[in-house]
C-alpha cells in the first residue's frame, strides 16, 4: 500500500512540474523558437535528412534531436507543449534511468525513488528539462551510455558483456547524431578513472570494439545520406561546430575556468545543502566500486568542459544524474546518523525564498527602483513572483519541522516556480524575448504580408513558427544563418541595410512588406535609416514597420 502511495505521489509530482504548467509559458527566442521552427519545417517538408531553418540549410547540429522534436509536434500539435514534449520525454526517461541505476547499485526502492525525485527537482534539470533545446536529449544518451557501460562491466558472461557494449555503442551513436562527437569524448573520460582504479582494462580492450562497431553502424545510414545530399556538412560540422566552438581562441561562449562553480551551486537548489556532504562522503567511500563510478561520472565531464574555451550551463546537465544518486544516498545516511546537512539545506531554502521575496519587492512598482521590472498594471505578476518565493521558503521551513522525516519535501520548494513562472514574466521581457506575444499583438498586420523581414534570427524563427511560413527574410544581420545564406539557392533571403531602399522599390507592388526590428528601449524609431513607412507599431523592444503597395 505504501508503494502505491509513493507511485501516486511521484505521478502527481511529475504532472505538476512537467505536464500541467508547460503550455502556460511562451516560447523563448532564440533557442526555443529556433528548434520549434526547424522541426515544424521538417514535418511540413517531409525532409528528415537535412535540417533547415527558414528554408535555409542549417548545419549547427545533427538530426536526431530534431527528429524527436518533430515527433512531439506531430503528436501534440504546433503548440507550446508540443514543442517541449520531446525534452520533457527525454528528461523523464533520464529520471527512469536514475531510478534503475540506483536500484542496481543499492537494491533500495526508497533510495531509488528519492534519487529520482531529487534529480527531477534540481533547478538546473527542471530549467533545462522543460526548455526546448537539444541538451536534455544528449544528457539522456550520455546517462544511458554510462548505465550500459556499467551493465557490461558487471556482467558475468560474454553474452552479457557483449550486449552491454553493443548498447553503449548505440547510445554513443545516437549522441553523435544529436549533438556531435562530444558524445564520444564524455563517456570515455567519465569511465577512465573507474577502469584504472578497478583494473578493468582487459574487458575494455576485449569488448570495446563492439561499442565502436555499433556506434558506427548507428550513425552510418544518416551519415552517408546527408553526405550524399550535402557533401560539405561533415566538414562544417566538425571544424566549425567542434574545433572552433570549444577549443580555439575565438570559440563561442568564452568563459573562465571557474564558470561552472556558480552553475553547480545554483543548479543544485533545492538540494544545495547536500552537495558538499554528498561529494565528501563519496570520496571517503571511494573504495566502493559504485561510488568511484558515480564520482568519476560527475567530476570528469565537469573538468573537461571547464578546460574547454566555450562554455554554457547546459553542457554539464548529464553530471547531475550521478550527483542526484550521491545526494540521495548521503541524505538517507544523514537522516539516520547526523541530520545537520538536512537542516542546513532547509535553512538555505528559507534564505533563498526570503531573498527572492525581498528582491521581488525591490524591482516591483512599489520598490525603490526608478525603472521597475514590472509596471503598475502588472501587479498580479508581482504577486505570482511573491508566491513562487513564498512557497520556496515555506517548504524549506516545513523540512525543518521533523527533519529526519520531512527533509524529502524540499522537492516541493520549486513547485510555485513550476506552476506560476509563466504568469510572472514581465511584459518588458515578453516583448523582446517572446515573439509569440508580439505576433499576438500584431497578428492582423502580419498575416497579409507578402514579405516579412527581420534583423534577428530568433525573432525570425518565432515569426515563422507562429505564422506557419518559412520565407522570412533576414535584414541587415545574418547571425547563425550566415553559412546557409552563402548557397546560391539562398539568393534573395538576405537584404542589407544599404540595399533595402532599392529592394523595397522593386518589390513594393507585389504586396505588403513588413519589417520587424529589434530596438533599444530608448531608441528613437524616427532615427532609423529606412524609407518613410505607412504603418509603425512599436511593442517596446520590437517594432513593426509596414510598407503598402503604391
Curated annotation (Swiss-Prot):
The keyword Nucleus does not apply. GO terms for cellular component: plasma membrane. One of its GO terms (molecular function) is mannosyltransferase activity. Pfam families: PMT (PF02366). Pathway: Lipopolysaccharide metabolism; 4-amino-4-deoxy-beta-L-arabinose-lipid A biosynthesis. It is a multi-pass membrane protein. Disulfide bonds: none annotated. It is an enzyme of class 2 (transferase). InterPro entries: ArnT_tfrase (IPR022839), Glyco_trans_39/83 (IPR003342), LipidA_mod_glycosyltrf_83 (IPR050297). One of its GO terms (biological process) is lipid A biosynthetic process. It catalyses: 4-amino-4-deoxy-alpha-L-arabinopyranosyl di-trans,octa-cis-undecaprenyl phosphate + lipid IVA = lipid IIA + di-trans,octa-cis-undecaprenyl phosphate. The keyword Lipid biosynthesis applies. Catalyzes the transfer of the L-Ara4N moiety of the glycolipid undecaprenyl phosphate-alpha-L-Ara4N to lipid A. The modified arabinose is attached to lipid A and is required for resistance to polymyxin and cationic antimicrobial peptides. Belongs to the glycosyltransferase 83 family. This is Undecaprenyl phosphate-alpha-4-amino-4-deoxy-L-arabinose arabinosyl transferase. It comes from Escherichia coli O1:K1 / APEC. The gene is arnT.
Amino acid at each position: 500500500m505504501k508503494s502505491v502511495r509513493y507511485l501516486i505521489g511521484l505521478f502527481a509530482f511529475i504532472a505538476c512540474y512537467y505536464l500541467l504548467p508547460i503550455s502556460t509559458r511562451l516560447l523563448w527566442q532564440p533557442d526555443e523558437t529556433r528548434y520549434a521552427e526547424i522541426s515544424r519545417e521538417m514535418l511540413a517538408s517531409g525532409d528528415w535528412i537535412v535540417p533547415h531553418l527558414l528554408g535555409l540549410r542549417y548545419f549547427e547540429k545533427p538530426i536526431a534531436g530534431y527528429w524527436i522534436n518533430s515527433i512531439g509536434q506531430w503528436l501534440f500539435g504546433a503548440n507550446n507543449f508540443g514543442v517541449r514534449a520531446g525534452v520533457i520525454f527525454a528528461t523523464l526517461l533520464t529520471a527512469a534511468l536514475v531510478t534503475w541505476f540506483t536500484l542496481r547499485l543499492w537494491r533500495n526502492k526508497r533510495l531509488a525513488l528519492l534519487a529520482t525525485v531529487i534529480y527531477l527537482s534540481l533547478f538546473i534539470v527542471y530549467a533545462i528539462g522543460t526548455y526546448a533545446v537539444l541538451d536534455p536529449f544528449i544528457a539522456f544518451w550520455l546517462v544511458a551510455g554510462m548505465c550500459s557501460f556499467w551493465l557490461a562491466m558487471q556482467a558475468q558472461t560474454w553474452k552479457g558483456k557483449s550486449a552491454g557494449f553493443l548498447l553503449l555503442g548505440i547510445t554513443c551513436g545516437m549522441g553523435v547524431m544529436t549533438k556531435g562527437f562530444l558524445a564520444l569524448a564524455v563517456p570515455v573520460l567519465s569511465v577512465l578513472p573507474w577502469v584504472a582504479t578497478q583494473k578493468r582494462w582487459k574487458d575494455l580492450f576485449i569488448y570495446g570494439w563492439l561499442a565502436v562497431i555499433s556506434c558506427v553502424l548507428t550513425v552510418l545510414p544518416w551519415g552517408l545520406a546527408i553526405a550524399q545530399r550535402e557533401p560539405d556538412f561533415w566538414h562544417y560540422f566538425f571544424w566549425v561546430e567542434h574545433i572552433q566552438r570549444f577549443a580555439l581562441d575565438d570559440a563561442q561562449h568564452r568563459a573562465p575556468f571557474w564558470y561552472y562553480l556558480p552553475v553547480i551551486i545554483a543548479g543544485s537548489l533545492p538540494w544545495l545543502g547536500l552537495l558538499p556532504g554528498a561529494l565528501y562522503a563519496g570520496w571517503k567511500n571511494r573504495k566502493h566500486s559504485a561510488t568511484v563510478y558515480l564520482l568519476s561520472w560527475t567530476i570528469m565531464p565537469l573538468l573537461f568542459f571547464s578546460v574547454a574555451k566555450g562554455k554554457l550551463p547546459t553542457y554539464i546537465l548529464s553530471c547531475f544524474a550521478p550527483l542526484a544518486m550521491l545526494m540521495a544516498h548521503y541524505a538517507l545516511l544523514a537522516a539516520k546518523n547526523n541530520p545537520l546537512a538536512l537542516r542546513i539545506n532547509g535553512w538555505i531554502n528559507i534564505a533563498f525564498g526570503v531573498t527572492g521575496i525581498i528582491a521581488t519587492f525591490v524591482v516591483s512598482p512599489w520598490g525603490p527602483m526608478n525603472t521597475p521590472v514590472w509596471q503598475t498594471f502588472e501587479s498580479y505578476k508581482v504577486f505570482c513572483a511573491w508566491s513562487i518565493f513564498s512557497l520556496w521558503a515555506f517548504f524549506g521551513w516545513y523540512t525543518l519541522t521533523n527533519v529526519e522525516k520531512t527533509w524529502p519535501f524540499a522537492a516541493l520548494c520549486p513547485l510555485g516556480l513550476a506552476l506560476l513562472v509563466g504568469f510572472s514574466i514581465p511584459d518588458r521581457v515578453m516583448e523582446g524575448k517572446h515573439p509569440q506575444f508580439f505576433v499576438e499583438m500584431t497578428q492582423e498586420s502580419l498575416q497579409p504580408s507578402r514579405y516579412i523581414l527581420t534583423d534577428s534570427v530568433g525573432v525570425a524563427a518565432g515569426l515563422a513558427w507562429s505564422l506557419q511560413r518559412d520565407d522570412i527574410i533576414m535584414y541587415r544581420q545574418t547571425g547563425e544563418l550566415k553559412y546557409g545564406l552563402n548557397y546560391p539557392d539562398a539568393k534573395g533571403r538576405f537584404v542589407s541595410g544599404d540595399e533595402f531602399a532599392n529592394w523595397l522599390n522593386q518589390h513594393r507592388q507585389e504586396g505588403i512588406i513588413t519589417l520587424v526590428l529589434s530596438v533599444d528601449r530608448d531608441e528613437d524609431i524616427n532615427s532609423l535609416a529606412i524609407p518613410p513607412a505607412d504603418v509603425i507599431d512599436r511593442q517596446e523592444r520590437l517594432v513593426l514597420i509596414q510598407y503598402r503597395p503604391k
